[in-house]
Amino acid sequence: MNVIVSNSSDVPLYMQIKEQIKDAILKGELEDGELLPSIRNFANDIQVSVLTIRRVYEELEKEGFAVSQAGRGT
């Protein structure tokens, strides 16, 4: 999954990331049951705060796009 963020955008970083993940899910680029990257690794890969990715994952879960399982990830 290729996520691109822009610090100069008016759209908050977490929303940019969340929308790109949702698009990947809706387009079938991410399959049902496929694990998302760990929060720490994903944050490092796209150079954003761990808190930003945590918020993205929490919102995706609230919206029904992700399920978090203890010990397995999101």
Predicted regions and their residues:
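Minor-groove-contacting beta-hairpin "wing" of winged helix-turn-helix DNA-binding domains
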Residues: S38, R72-T74
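Extreme N-terminal segment that seeds HTH/winged-HTH DNA-binding domains in transcriptional regulators
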Residues: M1-L35, N41
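Residues at secondary-structure transition points
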Residues: S8-P12, Q16, L51, E63, ...
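N-terminal helix-turn-helix
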Residues: L36-V67
